[in-house]
Amino acid sequence: MQTPRANYLLSCGGCHGLNGVSNSRLVPDLKDQVGFFLNLPEGRGYLGRLPNVAFSITTDEALTGLLNYMVFTLGGASVPKGTKPYTLREVSQLRRQPLTEVSLVQMRQHMVRVLIDQDHATTNLRRYGENDYRSPPSPQDQ
């Protein structure tokens, strides 16, 4: 069985970057930002129901490890205190209800507005709701 980091690198790193910093203006960074979504109940579900997550060819167990790696390792300080890890049962249920009938960009933009309005997230998360999703690179990412 592969480690969650290895699964991330194989399944997500090509678009979201090896350390969670995307090389594309159209793909959101995960590093120090993905955890903000866990301030909202729908945000937690959103992460587990994204089509590339829900339809991934990995097992529920591996996907649970992958989501927890993304949130707790890549999410850094953006993860709310007291956040519980995803459970196998939760991930199994979420991926059976994939987001397919909604605009993912509109849904993400709405959550970003709510998070910023409620002071759950820094304003650099606003980039998730704009055309240029990239956060400024940190020195260690350059």
Regions found by a protein language model. Give the residues of each.
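Flexible coil segments in periplasmic/lumen-exposed cytochrome c-class electron-transfer proteins
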Residues: 72-142
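Sequence/structural segment immediately N-terminal to covalent heme-attachment motifs in c-type
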Residues: 1-21, 39
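Internal catalytic or translocation cores that form aromatic/hydrophobic pockets or channels
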Residues: 55-65, 69-78
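Non-catalytic, surface-exposed connector residues within folded enzymatic/regulatory domains
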Residues: 24, 60, 81-85
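Extracytoplasmic/secreted proteins, especially bacterial periplasmic and envelope-associated proteins
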Residues: 3, 7, 25, 29, ...
